[in-house]
């Protein structure tokens, strides 16, 4: 049963990357929320995952983990850093520009955008580690 579920990990990772990308685009272009610098860096890690994981899932190409796992882990690290900026008093980033990286915007009323981003990157990374080829 577990082996059967592991064959769908690439599809699930692709789904998480699609949802994250759609949320990012929705907040930026529909709700006109200007992203901070760290959000842009997270997007640099997330947006290519949609294409790469989509193709890999379609072709059942597990070897893609070599390329996608570093993107997911770097994105996760940036998201965790931004969570720390928001949650730890006194932490600031001087290069943020107009929009502060420590500004809290809540999704669904209880989770901040960097926390959601960290959860998505963590889920993608875990799914990539668990992914196996179906037989």
Swiss-Prot record:
Question: Where does this one sit in the cell?
Answer: Cell inner membrane
Membrane topology term reads: Multi-pass membrane protein
Q: Does the keyword Membrane apply?
A: yes
Transmembrane stretches, start-end: 7-26, 41-60, 67-84, 109-131
Return the GO cellular component terms, semicolon-separated: plasma membrane
Q: Check the record and name the InterPro entries matching this protein.
A: DiS_bond_form_DsbB/BdbC, Disulphide_bond_form_BdbC, DsbB-like_sf
One molecular function GO term is: protein-disulfide reductase activity
GO BP term, pick one: protein folding
Q: Which cysteines are joined by disulfide bonds?
A: 36-39, 96-101
Q: What does this protein do?
A: Required for disulfide bond formation in some proteins.
HAMAP family xrefs = BdbC
PANTHER family in UniProt: DISULFIDE FORMATION PROTEIN-RELATED, SPBETA PROPHAGE-DERIVED DISULFIDE BOND FORMATION PROTEIN B
Name the NCBIfam families for this protein.
PRK00611.1
Query: What is the protein named?
Result: Probable disulfide formation protein
């Amino acid at each position: 049963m577990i082996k059967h579920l592991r064959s769908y990990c690439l599809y699930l990772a692709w789904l998480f990357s699609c949802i994250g990308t759609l949320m990012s685009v929705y907040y930026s272009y529909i709700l006109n929320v200007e992203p901070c610098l760290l959000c842009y860096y997270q997007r640099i890690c997330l947006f290519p995952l949609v294409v790469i994981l989509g193709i890999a899932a379609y072709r059942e190409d597990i070897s893609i983990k070599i390329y996608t796992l570093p993107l997911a882990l770097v994105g996760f690290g940036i998201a965790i850093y931004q969570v720390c900026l928001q949650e730890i008093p006194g932490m600031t980033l001087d290069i943020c520009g107009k929009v502060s990286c420590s500004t809290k915007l809540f999704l669904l009323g209880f989770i901040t955008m960097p926390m959601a981003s960290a959860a998505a990157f963590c889920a993608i990374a875990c799914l990539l580690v668990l992914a196996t080829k179906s037989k």
